[in-house]
UniProtKB/Swiss-Prot annotation:
The gene is ALIS3. It is found in: Golgi apparatus membrane; Prevacuolar compartment membrane; Endoplasmic reticulum membrane. Keywords: Acetylation, Endoplasmic reticulum, Glycoprotein, Golgi apparatus, Membrane, Transmembrane, Transmembrane helix. This is ALA-interacting subunit 3. Its main location: Golgi. The modification N-acetylserine is found at S2. PANTHER family: CDC50, ISOFORM A, CELL CYCLE CONTROL PROTEIN 50. It comes from Arabidopsis thaliana.
Amino acid sequence: MSSNTASSSAGAAGSGDSSAARKNSKRPKYSKFTQQELPACKPILTPGWVISTFLIVSVIFIPLGVISLFASQDVVEIVDRYDTECIPAPARTNKVAYIQGDGDKVCNRDLKVTKRMKQPIYVYYQLENFYQNHRRYVKSRSDSQLRSTKYENQISACKPEDDVGGQPIVPCGLIAWSLFNDTYALSRNNVSLAVNKKGIAWKSDKEHKFGNKVFPKNFQKGNITGGATLDPRIPLSEQEDLIVWMRTAALPTFRKLYGKIESDLEMGDTIHVKLNNNYNTYSFNGKKKLVLSTTSWLGGKNDFLGIAYLTVGGICFILALAFTIMYLVKPRRLGDPSYLSWNRNPGGR
């Protein structure tokens, strides 16, 4: 009786130990995923597959490249660099002093239309060597202040353009302070060409990032004026030049939309531009350009996409041709294990 009791006690203890071991085990629950036993496909890259793949890529990419280049060639673009030409010859030895000085800085430029331009014609200003992506510059703004009057005093990130005499600047920060302030007045045959400045900003920016009850306050009233001024009677959501400028560029050369011409320009037309050369790009060796451009279904003029497609397609075609020649001239045995030396001659070394 006692032996039975002892054996049952030992059995109970053993089962308890095994269950405890199972409970304390760190072995993960078995699954094909954790044990890397999922079904997999390992294609054998035979010459036929490799050549066919390169040919398919080339057949797709080369036509896409040609289509993209044709679309880019349909875009008519006029680019005029004026930053140097709009400085009087005697003042070109010290351009910074000229642009910072008082006086009229009106400049007249004539642009020749070499090909018919259908409306809408987009007017851009292009800046070069201007690093809007600089960390300190990008962070110098207050998005909450731009959206609502409740956050008017949230200006800690905007230094040094945060306040004037203890009163907050709206909009604050270096981005708004450096707002582009060159202006363009276009005419053709002594008839003014209207440049529509409505609808140049993103709708999402106007509706969600700039409040319709937030008005400029103390803007450009510091010791140094950075760029354009803002009408204090117009809410920020309607100041589209500011909204366009506040969407910072990723690269040092960029274009920003100035307005739209909503009439066609014929080949041979001469566009007279009366511009105010106010913006100081001379202190950092920057460049300023005025751009008139049409668009295509692919966007503005940009040959890069077409060239990239053609380059990839051409490389794939050359590789397909090279592999075909190699396969026909000097074919290689299939990579089958049966061709391994120790399989073909098991007894050999």
